[in-house]
Amino acid sequence: YIDETYLKNVLDAPLIEAAKHNIAVAAIILVEPAAKCIDPDLGILLQHPNYLRGVYTMPNMTNLESVNCYAAAFDFLAKRYCTTNNRYGRIAHWIMHNEVDGSVDWTNMGIKPVTVFADTYIKSMRICYNIVRQYDEHAEVFASLTHSWTQIANVGWWLYTSKEIIDLLNV
């Protein structure tokens, strides 16, 4: 199912080179909407059911099959890139999605109250954390937010402020 040539050339090679030079690598985890996914069935499974538009979708956390698929992807990546021998290189930092306060474009799951959005985001982060830490106790998982702490940066693209999401992450 996985294109080994792609992995070796596009992911492994630069990660191995970074590991040789003791460079810590951060990976941004993004989920393409089904229409852009090379495997439409997989895309439908991972795309949030309320996705409306945007570059990326929030992963689907609404059913067990989708959650298990999402978790399996992390398990595959963590087994490969969180080992002590660095055979394929290493991902030290896992950045969950992109500028999530700009959710309309970067992690679209439709228009939701900030509490519902943050709950889904936290679930996505926890899946990553719980899986990668099984393979690398030093791996770190980060949130991704804009610099727009208390005001919505771009009305129409942003639904929440960074502070609203951070406050809910800290509950």
Model feature map: region roles:
Residues Y1-C82, N86, A92-I95, D101-P113, ...:
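N-terminal substrate-binding region of glycoside hydrolase catalytic domains
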Residues R90, F117-V171:
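Noncatalytic carbohydrate-binding groove/subsite architecture in carbohydrate-active enzymes
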